[in-house]
Curated annotation (Swiss-Prot):
Top-rank lineage group of the source organism: Bacteria
Protein name (record): UPF0309 protein BCAN_B0929
Family (UniProt): Belongs to the UPF0309 family.
Gene Ontology BP, a term: carbohydrate derivative metabolic process
Species assigned in the record: Brucella canis (strain ATCC 23365 / NCTC 10854 / RM-666)
CDD domains documented for this protein: SIS_RpiR
GO molecular function: carbohydrate derivative binding
Domain annotation SIS: ranges: 30-214
Pfam families: SIS_2
Amino acid sequence: MTEITDRYFNDVIARLSGLRDRLAAQMEKAADLIAAAARADRRVYVFGTGHSHMMAEELHYRAGGLAITVPILCGSIMLQDGAVASSHFERIEGAVRPILDRYGIRDGDVLVVVSNSGVNAAPIEAARYAREKGAAIIALTSVAYSNTIARGRTQLLSLADVVLDNDAPSGDAVLEIAGSALKVGPVSTALGVTILNAVFADVAARLVGEGDAPIYLSANMPGSGDINRSLVERYRDRNPHL
């Protein structure tokens, strides 16, 4: 490794080690909410804009993932249809309600809202929408970053039932480069994916113990075709992305 790649690995590993202990109670609370939704045949929706939408894709139709998970995906809040436009769109009040209306979020569901800054209009609106519908809210955000830039604005962390603080610094990037004021090496994705997969693994373990764990297999594993087809048929009525 070069010096800077070594620093990046060390930073991410140190943050993950700290999160494992510091977030233990909050992760257990998040798993409680998701497991309760699974037992009641409810759904767990995952919403994020910009790069945060990758969390929704990560948990959707995933080998080793839960079939109760529904990603909220729309080109206008993602990056592939125009990154600059998407960054503008996520700041417009009222813009995401029509997107959320397509999914049928209801009482007993869970909405995971992912936003590193936790202050843009889209994640705030998503959390308020979930509250209106009677769904529980899990926020994955950077508390430090959000507190730094809030300046009186509503913060996602104030609207959630459970807050998962990803420990990303303000601005996300962690590596200074000699001779430059710029930083590189964003960490929020690596930290966020690890946190959410750990929570969902906890939920899966509980459901296995209770005899009903709707877990997808990798498409290349023996027997995966029948298992995955059965899960798709069971859950596709409330997941438009299957």
